[in-house]
Amino acid sequence: MSLLTEVETPTRNEWECRCSDSSDPLIVAASIIGILHLILWILDRLFFKCIYRRLKYGLKRGPSTAGVPESMREEYRQEQQSAVDVDDGHFVNIELE
């Protein structure tokens, strides 16, 4: 009799394991935690850009414009756009020796 036949008894399905203590609550809890961990890891890898962008920037989408007149909204948009615009003619070349 070999050690393999004493420890593990193969079944017909090849996926099942005949363990006398497989109904142990600790084994069941570990299996559930392992499956949940796998599911969360897969979801994290699928949606990591959305998740971490949401954590980094929060739920904010910008300042609220409720109650602000349309003329002030347009002025704010123009200020934001002008802050983004860059004049390409003002570059400085620095040469290191």
Curated annotation (Swiss-Prot):
The record marks 41 as: Seems to be involved in pH gating. It comes from the Viruses. The keyword Membrane applies. It is a single-pass type III membrane protein. The record marks 37 as: Essential for channel activity, possibly by being protonated during channel activation, and by forming the channel gate and the selective filter. Residues 44-97 are intravirion. Keywords: Disulfide bond, Host cell membrane, Host membrane, Host-virus interaction, Hydrogen ion transport, Inhibition of host autophagy by virus, Ion channel, Ion transport, Lipoprotein, Membrane, Palmitate, Phosphoprotein, Signal-anchor, Transmembrane, Transmembrane helix, Transport, Viral ion channel, Virion. The chain crosses the membrane at residues 23-43. One of its GO terms (cellular component) is membrane. A lipid is attached at residue 50 (S-palmitoyl cysteine). The modification Phosphoserine is found at residues 64, 82. The M2 protein from most influenza A strains is inhibited by amantadine and rimantadine, resulting in viral uncoating incapacity. Emergence of amantadine-resistant variants is usually rapid. InterPro entries: Flu_M2 (IPR002089). One of its GO terms (biological process) is symbiont-mediated suppression of host autophagy. One of its GO terms (molecular function) is monoatomic ion channel activity. Forms a proton-selective ion channel that is necessary for the efficient release of the viral genome during virus entry. After attaching to the cell surface, the virion enters the cell by endocytosis. Acidification of the endosome triggers M2 ion channel activity. Cytoplasmic tail plays an important role in virion assembly and morphogenesis. When the channel is activated, one or more imidazole moieties of His-37 probably become bi-protonated. Belongs to the influenza viruses matrix protein M2 family. This is Matrix protein 2. The lineage of its organism: Viruses, Riboviria, Orthornavirae, Negarnaviricota, Polyploviricotina.
